[in-house]
Amino acid sequence: MDQMNYQNKKVLVYGWARSGKAVYQLLKKIGANVYVTADEEPTDLFDDVNFVDDIDESFDLLVKNPGIRYEKEIIKKALNLNIPVITEVQVALDQFKGEVLAVTGSNGKTTTTTLIGKMLKADNVDVKVGGNIGIPVSELMLSDSQPRVLMLELSSFQLLGAQNIKPKIAVITNLFSSHIDFHHTRGNYLRAKFSITQHQTKDDYLVLNDSSIDSKDFAKRSQADDYYFSPTNTSVNTYVNDGTIYFDDEKIIDLSKVVLVGEHNLENILAAVTAAKIFGVSNRAIEKVLTSFKGLEHRLEAVGVIKERTVYNDSKATDIEATQKALASFKEPINLIAGGLDRGDDLNRLVPNFKNVVSLITYGQTKNKLQSAGEKAGIKQTVVVDTLKEAVAKAKELSRPGQVLLFSPAAASWDQFPNFEIRGEEFKKMIKNREGWS
């Protein structure tokens, strides 16, 4: 793809979070004339920042924070003036000379990105990991030296403003209807996701989930060489057979050696193995990672065994599909805490997944819908409360030794918490309080 020239261009950075600060510094470094705007003037602006309240025809480019909606007046004005609107990912990748590996999808992006990054590092590949995983790509480009490889997690928000991306290996973990409040339609969401492969050529690779209904369509429209993974279909590239992971019929590792738990994590592992093998990572390096990596915080995170209950924090389960995967990960009786922001999802889709749930404690905006789903599933104990604190107290009371206590909200956190991370931290604090256990 042709790279954009930023030298002497007048650029407006919209949003002053970590990514805004990083792209501001990068744009200054490469010779742009940079201005900053935000919905409210930040209190931590750098001393040399030119803050403005609006955009006009004198600007050449607007770089927005990925999460800012396109309905904002400044963005609409920029588009009406034919000023390009991009995210910091595009600015950063225009400066990068090495190979890009990128992961997107509805769920599993962060775990899959982390696994691939660790596998590359275990094989002594010079790689930096960033993107939606927490480190802005622009921040990685501030260093005077560049790595051989960038391993990136990219959200639909980032991809929508990075139309020039061309990864050597693109991974799509899965595709559900997600972030419809931002994208408005499933079609718009899928178009944003397709951006990850839109400019790939026959010399590039696209890794797809065999069970995602949109995978075949993506493969048909992409020019890249497609590879599939599946925990159930042994006719694809990366699969599981008789308790062993294979890639193109080559034995990689026995599942008994893998320490990362969860049905959904098996798909993440298969996606990571596929990308790693395409890149040329050794089986030794792959095995080293899979026999030691226990998972990320808030993603079916084992909090511990407390009063003979095994407790899991799955605060990252911000949609129905993630909670479905979490519930499928256990054979033991489950005491489930769920609830959060109501985005209009049909929570009755969880009914078939409730077969091992012995008590359901719901809170937040979705509490009544979840209780209704639980009653339809025949759960004997369904309890509605207002807050997570009350839910944890009730779960302590209802759970019994030998059972699982699972916090998997099936909803975003924003009705009561700023993000899923803070929600998960609060859950762990409440659980570790020894009071209230029956």
From Swiss-Prot:
Enzyme Commission code: 6.3.2.9
| Entry superkingdom | Bacteria
Q: What class of enzyme is it?
A: ligase
Q: Which SUPFAM superfamilies match?
A: MurCD N-terminal domain (SSF51984), MurD-like peptide ligases, catalytic domain (SSF53623), MurD-like peptide ligases, peptide-binding domain (SSF53244)
Q: What does this protein do?
A: Cell wall formation. Catalyzes the addition of glutamate to the nucleotide precursor UDP-N-acetylmuramoyl-L-alanine (UMA).
Q: Which family does it belong to?
A: Belongs to the MurCDEF family.
* Identification of the protein by name: UDP-N-acetylmuramoylalanine--D-glutamate ligase
Q: Which gene does this sequence derive from?
A: murD
